[in-house]
């Protein structure tokens, strides 16, 4: 009887900690995705202004 109760309490604690871990992991994942999106869009995080798009190859001026 006592062992059964302790087992149930332990499983509830594990479920709670797993739920908290999932929420933390989701928040971290969303943060990384937002950071990657800002980087891909070329937004400068220092002053919040967007940089002009840069070309990988320069066009020859005519």
UniProtKB/Swiss-Prot annotation:
UniProt keyword Mitochondrion present: no
Main location: host cell
Segments on the Cytoplasmic side according to the record's topology features: 1-23
GO cellular component: host cell nuclear membrane; host cell plasma membrane; host cell rough endoplasmic reticulum membrane; membrane
Pfam family membership, one: Polyoma_agno
Assigned keywords, A-Z: Host cell membrane, Host cytoplasm, Host endoplasmic reticulum, Host membrane, Host nucleus, Host-virus interaction, Ion channel, Ion transport, Membrane, Phosphoprotein, Signal-anchor, Transmembrane, Transmembrane helix, Transport, Viral ion channel
Membrane spanning stretches: 24-40
InterPro entries in the cross-refs: Polyoma_agno (IPR002643)
Post-translational modification remark: Phosphorylated by host kinase. Phosphorylation segregates agnoprotein in cytoplasm, whereas unphosphorylated agnoprotein migrate to the nucleus.
GO biological process per UniProt: monoatomic ion transmembrane transport
Disulfide bonds: none
Any one Gene Ontology molecular-function term assigned to this protein's record: channel activity
Keyword rRNA-binding part of the UniProt annotation: no
Chain ranges on the Extracellular side, renumbered to this chain: 41-62
Subunit relationships: Homooligomer. Interacts with VP1. Interacts with large T antigen; this interaction may impact upon the activity of T-antigen on the control of viral gene transcription and replication. Interacts with small t antigen. Interacts with host CBX5; this interaction induces the dissociation of CBX5 from LBR, resulting in destabilization of the nuclear envelope.
Stated role: Alters the structure of the nuclear envelope by interacting with host CBX5 and disrupting CBX5 association with LBR. Involved in the perinuclear-nuclear localization of the capsid protein VP1 during virion assembly and maturation. Plays an important role in the release of progeny virions from infected cells and in viral propagation, probably by acting as a viral ionic channel in the host plasma membrane. Allows influx of extracellular calcium ions in the host cell. May contribute to viral genome transcription and translation of viral late proteins.
Official protein name in the record: Agnoprotein
Organism of this sequence: Simian virus 40
């Amino acid at each position: 009887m006592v062992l059964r109760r302790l087992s149930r309490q332990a499983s509830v604690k594990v479920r709670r900690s797993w739920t908290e871990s999932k929420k933390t992991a989701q928040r971290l994942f969303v943060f990384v995705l937002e950071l990657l999106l800002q980087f891909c869009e070329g937004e400068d995080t220092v002053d919040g202004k967007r940089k002009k798009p840069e070309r990988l190859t320069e066009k020859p001026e005519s």
